[in-house]
Amino acid sequence: MFSWVSKDARRKKEPELFQTVSEGLRQLYAQKLLPLEEHYRFHEFHSPALEDADFDNKPMVLLVGQYSTGKTTFIRHLIEQDFPGMRIGPEPTTDSFIAVMHGPTEGVVPGNALVVDPRRPFRKLNAFGNAFLNRFMCAQLPNPVLDSISIIDTPGILSGEKQRISRGYDFAAVLEWFAERVDRIILLFDAHKLDISDEFSEVIKALKNHEDKIRVVLNKADQIETQQLMRVYGALMWSLGKIINTPEVVRVYIGSFWSHPLLIPDNRKLFEAEEQDLFKDIQSLPRNAALRKLNDLIKRARLAKVHAYIISSLKKEMPNVFGKESKKKELVNNLGEIYQKIEREHQISPGDFPNLRKMQELLQTQDFSKFQALKPKLLDTVDDMLANDIARLMVMVRQEESLMPAQVVKGGAFDGTMNGPFGHGYGEGAGEGIDDVEWVVGKDKPTYDEIFYTLSPVNGKITGANAKKEMVKSKLPNTVLGKIWKLADVDRDGLLDDEEFALANHLIKVKLEGHELPADLPPHLVPPSKRRHE
């Protein structure tokens, strides 16, 4: 009796089983979110339907900036190789969107061929028409960096209404399409001629729903002196604060991202540290790709739910027979009030609603009679996905991340910063003396010995209490001094001999010079008499 009820209940209770996060996202989207999107014509208002390639593609990095800020040179610097279609110069050179991707041989795939390839995540770009597709291509080449990531080069953004109109396609809309699908958006600025044109401001505003993906690079910083660089950095932060209306400060990397000698080498250490941080951020993308796709699907589901409430509310307000056109105009003009009503009734955050002005423009061309009434079952399915399925996928994301190395991207400029004497921080701080035959602490040991013998050593060793009296003079916090003690007490007897005391003072000096302490004592810092214990 009532077997259909028990079957339905059983089906609801049984969790979906997925082999990978990508497969899980693909199935959840197709089975639970896509029906809601199609029912309320989501794709006509916001974003085209997702395809399999959107869930399986490699992480993508989108480069955006005004002309001659070094976008193409930045890619050349990363992959250490010229790519097909590459043009570099002081004038606006890159006039196309170029997807730089891995391929068995060097070559160019034109836009019209690219958007019919089901293996590439670009099929929905055909909606932007031939004017765009003629300015879109894929440069493919065998390169180890491109094994892990793909990079999208964009045309330089110009100033003035004429250039915006003459493109023949909606540049900001294309960038917004890419922004939804990429893992990182890098905005490049030229430190030598800092200027944010009106079109660039509009582009940055179009990316406002993706602040978590945005990083800023202040490029060509070696062309100006330190004092000027501080002023330029301040001006950039002030300008960005006016455009990106968020309380969080956007991360800005300062440097000169090309392989030529630095023109003004005063800030070399700063540039090296910033480059290392940026490279680490890019190298983490493959590891975090599944989490990014999961996050984007959640954002899309929340927007689809709000969209369903908006469309169903408009349908509910429309008359059945007379006065449809006048009512439509009234509803479009009063859309802000409908937003507020939905916000109150369904406890939805204001940040989940689509842009009011853009939505009003899109609604003016729609036939409201084709809109659908509210269908709670579709919304319940999406709520169930967000509450249960996504939580299970989150566990799988962590499992997949734990199996991947922290830095997956290899080759190109990334190899130059990894190991060897030119790796970041090599031979500095605790790494000083790593290649020396003599113990690096030995050169300062006579000075430390003078202090050591004033601390009443017994049988050649001083107690922790006596060592503490001297160590606290450094004014370092007890937590740091405790770590130094642990590293210096190599034989773990709770006492320090003359070599261990010298080592403790060397580590204090390392910390006072602004370097980090190692988690474990490096082999080259182990005192000579203790090396038999190692």
UniProtKB/Swiss-Prot annotation:
* UniProt keyword list: Acetylation, ATP-binding, Calcium, Cell membrane, Cell projection, Cilium, Cilium biogenesis/degradation, Coiled coil, Endosome, Membrane, Metal-binding, Nucleotide-binding, Phosphoprotein, Protein transport, Transport
Region annotation (G3 motif) maps to: 153-156
**A GO CC term assigned to this protein in UniProt:** plasma membrane
Which chain positions lie within coiled-coil regions?
A: 198-227
Return the annotated region ranges for G4 motif. Answer: 219-222
Q: Which residues bind Ca(2+)?
A: 489, 491, 493, 500
Residue ranges, annotated region (G1 motif): 65-72
Q: Biological process GO annotation list?
A: cellular response to nerve growth factor stimulus; cilium assembly; endocytic recycling; endocytosis; intracellular protein transport; neuron projection development; positive regulation of endocytic recycling; positive regulation of myoblast fusion
Q: Where is this region: G5 motif?
A: 243
Q: Which residues carry this modification: N-acetylmethionine?
A: 1
Q: Where does ATP bind?
A: 65-72, 220, 258
InterPro entries given in the database record: DUF5600, Dynamin_N, EF-hand-dom_pair, EF_Hand_1_Ca_BS, EF_hand_dom, EH_dom, EHD_N, G_DYNAMIN_dom
PTM Phosphoserine: list the residues. Answer: 456
Q: Where is the EH domain?
A: 444-532
Where is it chiefly localized?
membrane
What is a GO molecular function of this protein? calcium ion binding
Instruction: Name its cellular compartments.
Output: Recycling endosome membrane; Early endosome membrane; Cell membrane; Cell projection, Cilium membrane
Q: What does this protein do?
A: ATP- and membrane-binding protein that controls membrane reorganization/tubulation upon ATP hydrolysis. Acts in early endocytic membrane fusion and membrane trafficking of recycling endosomes. Recruited to endosomal membranes upon nerve growth factor stimulation, indirectly regulates neurite outgrowth. Plays a role in myoblast fusion. Involved in the unidirectional retrograde dendritic transport of endocytosed BACE1 and in efficient sorting of BACE1 to axons implicating a function in neuronal APP processing.
Q: Which family does it belong to?
A: Belongs to the TRAFAC class dynamin-like GTPase superfamily. Dynamin/Fzo/YdjA family. EHD subfamily.
Q: What is known of its domains?
A: The EH domain interacts with Asn-Pro-Phe (NPF) motifs of target proteins.
By what name is this protein known?
Answer: EH domain-containing protein 1
Q: Provide the species name.
A: Bos taurus
